[in-house]
Amino acid sequence: MKNQLLDAKVASEEQETVLRPSLLNDFIGQNQMKSNLTIFITSSIERDESLDHTLLHGPPGLGKTSIAQIIAKEKNVNLKSTAGPILSKAADLAAILTNLQKNDVLFIDEIHRLNIHVEEILYSAMEDFSLDIMIGEGPSARSVKIYLPKFTLIGATTRLGLISKPLCDRFGIHLKLNFYSCEELTQIVERGAKVLNVALDTNAAIEIANRSRGTPRIALRLLKRVRDFGIYQNINPLNQQITDYALNQLGIDKLGLDSSDHKYLRFIAENYDGGPVGIDTIAAALSEQRDTIEEMIEPYLIQIGFVQRTQRGRVITANALKHLH
């Protein structure tokens, strides 16, 4: 199982509230996306209209939820949040939509996991800002059209390919979030340290950033765990030595890989001479769900050039073999 410290899907309540940036100017990284979004938001405010429906996609932990909250804050409108798996019935979505006010933001996380019947309700809501509701049953049932105030739907997904084309095409704005650079993560760690009232030197911040898999959520989680080691050993401010020790104790190597990553790489290296090998074979051998491997393990390994996805299966690179040895 993936080390929860490196699981970008796991977020603490503290991170959700205290450590999130509240405005675009506070948001570190994703500069091209941020620049475009500033233009879109400013234009919508000048026109006194809702922002076009927006689809945010990219690996977990990169700031999709934060962006949704920032959009609502910048627009000075209400934000309603839910998630694809929660909306099991069309009535669930209809109840949310009918309570929206003009220009409000509805954020649906994991939108690729929407029930197809719920998704179909969204089509007219997104295009025409209306709902067709069936009242009654049997021969006496009739359809009633309910008109909605203009709103902005923000969908977030880690699996863009799983979103149906009809739904995808209804988003006027598509924004991709990429992994962060070490420099950007260092700034995020330093900002997080100030918010948490943690003293640390630059080398400690860089060490945490280097091991954070390009992901702010992981960087902030590691910062808090290093803080714990510093308190236990009475080290203040946090320095590179205690940071290195803490992260080693947590099973996180210099590149941010944990035992699950090493197990994945070694399986391919030792059993298939570096690959190719099919994803289902890997999942069975590691006793992991295919989705877990594709969402939590592979993206970063591909990003750092350790794994290649080919038509014949997964292949690990010479750099990966060098790192293992």
Curated annotation (Swiss-Prot):
Amino-acid positions noted as binding ATP in the UniProt annotation, renumbered to this chain: L19, R20, G61, K64, T65, S66, E127, D128, F129, R170, Y180, R217
InterPro entries listed in its UniProt record: AAA+_ATPase, AAA_lid_4, DNA_helicase_Holl-junc_RuvB, P-loop_NTPase, RuvB-like_N, RuvB_C, WH-like_DNA-bd_sf, WH_DNA-bd_sf
Keywords, ordered alphabetically: ATP-binding, Cytoplasm, DNA damage, DNA recombination, DNA repair, DNA-binding, Hydrolase, Nucleotide-binding
Subcellular location: Cytoplasm
CDD domains found in the cross-reference section: AAA (cd00009)
UniProt main location, coarse: cytoplasm
Reaction catalyzed: ATP + H2O = ADP + phosphate + H(+)
Domain of life of the organism encoding this protein: Bacteria
Keyword Nucleotide-binding in annotation: yes
Ligand binding (Mg(2+)): T65
Protein name (database record): Holliday junction branch migration complex subunit RuvB
Gene: ruvB
